[in-house]
């Protein structure tokens, strides 16, 4: 034995081990602390689904998209630059305001699931970096200057300010999960849909492909939050139904205002009809999320019709005709974003 290591410090289960910063082991820990056993089959299924559908930014080649950027009008280019500036920053928005929720749980299924979610969020961040550079013709200096100007745009600030205010007044763990559901399930919905409309013009095909993959990942993340809210917050009082409906209504109003305020006024990609369909989709998404947490719909919004570009994103193994690589998604989680 190395004389520099005391016998007490060699046993990670020794409750008498000492050392600066050492966390005491509970006197009567549950046996599951020391080995894996499945305790959350629904969350374990989502982890397995995430692993089965792992992907990397290196699998996507954006050369054709770089050529398509010149086909966008000035208003369209500005709009999509704005959306991707928001989406790129949104992961930090979630982490800064609602991070650490995984630390509330001892079930290894939940902890293991969050590891997978964090891994794929890294891929999303890297993909958004690539897409931003594509939209700026690989001019990183111009991209940086644009993001610095845009990150405090009123349309983005209203989302940030709303979230920060709701977090400050939030006094329960279940309500924080409602906020997480709304960020990933409502605050991204209009952006994902607007990006998907590029497909209808056969533009930025790989960007559309990555949007499909990211949207499907976020559908899994939102479903996981709903499952945790439903099944694994015992001992925590859930917010009253009126409070939940109020939060949903506020989030939907903000998201619809976000897309209305930024959409180009003269676009062959986003017609008035397309914008109306996106707004309906935001309401439909909210209703679906309410259903996942066993609540009645707020809007009774109809499902998007077959022409809606995100209709290709159900997880029934649809493959986009325009895509070089199939974005078929194994499993049965329905995209509700």
From Swiss-Prot:
The active site is at residue 128. Ribonucleoside-diphosphate reductase holoenzyme provides the precursors necessary for viral DNA synthesis. Allows virus growth in non-dividing cells, as well as reactivation from latency in infected hosts. Catalyzes the biosynthesis of deoxyribonucleotides from the corresponding ribonucleotides. One of its GO terms (molecular function) is ribonucleoside-diphosphate reductase activity, thioredoxin disulfide as acceptor. Belongs to the ribonucleoside diphosphate reductase small chain family. One of its GO terms (cellular component) is membrane. It is a single-pass membrane protein. It comes from Human herpesvirus 2 (strain HG52) (HHV-2). It catalyses: a 2'-deoxyribonucleoside 5'-diphosphate + [thioredoxin]-disulfide + H2O = a ribonucleoside 5'-diphosphate + [thioredoxin]-dithiol. It is an enzyme of class 1 (oxidoreductase). The lineage of its organism: Viruses, Duplodnaviria, Heunggongvirae, Peploviricota, Herviviricetes. Keywords: DNA replication, Host membrane, Iron, Membrane, Metal-binding, Oxidoreductase, Transmembrane, Transmembrane helix, Viral latency, Viral reactivation from latency. This is Ribonucleoside-diphosphate reductase small subunit. It is found in: Host membrane.
């Amino acid at each position: 034995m190395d004389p520099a290591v005391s016998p007490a410090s060699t046993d990670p289960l020794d409750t008498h081990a000492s050392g600066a910063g050492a966390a005491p082991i509970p006197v009567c820990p549950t046996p599951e602390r020391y080995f894996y056993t499945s305790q959350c089959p629904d969350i374990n299924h989502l982890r397995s689904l995430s692993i089965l559908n792992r992907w990397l930014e290196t699998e996507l080649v954006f050369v054709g998209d770089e050529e398509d950027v010149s086909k966008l009008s000035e208003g369209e280019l500005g709009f999509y630059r704005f959306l991707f500036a928001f989406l790129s920053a949104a992961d930090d928005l979630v982490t800064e305001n609602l991070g650490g929720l995984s630390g509330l749980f001892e079930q290894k299924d939940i902890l293991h699931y969050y590891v997978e979610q964090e891994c794929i969020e890294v891929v999303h961040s890297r993909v958004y970096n690539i897409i931003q550079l594509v939209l700026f013709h690989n001019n990183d200096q111009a991209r940086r200057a644009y993001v610095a100007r845009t990150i405090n745009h009123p349309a983005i600030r209203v989302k940030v300010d709303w979230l920060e205010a709701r977090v400050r007044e939030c006094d329960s763990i279940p309500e924080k999960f409602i906020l997480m559901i709304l960020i990933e399930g409502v605050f991204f919905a209009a952006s994902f849909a607007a990006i998907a409309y590029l497909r209808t013009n056969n533009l930025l095909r790989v960007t559309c492909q990555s949007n499909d993959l990211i949207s499907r990942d976020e559908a899994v993340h939102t479903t996981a939050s709903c499952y945790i809210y439903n099944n694994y917050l015992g001992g925590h009082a859930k917010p009253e139904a009126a409070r939940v409906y109020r939060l949903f209504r506020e989030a939907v109003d903000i998201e619809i205002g976000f897309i209305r305020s930024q959409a180009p006024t003269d676009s062959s990609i986003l017609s008035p009809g397309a914008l109306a369909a996106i707004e309906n989709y935001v309401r439909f998404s909210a209703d679906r999320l309410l259903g996942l947490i066993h609540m009645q719909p707020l809007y009774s919004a109809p499902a998007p019709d077959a022409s809606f570009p995100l209709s290709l994103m159900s997880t029934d193994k649809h493959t986009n005709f325009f895509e070089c690589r199939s974005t078929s998604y194994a499993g049965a989680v329905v995209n509700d974003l």
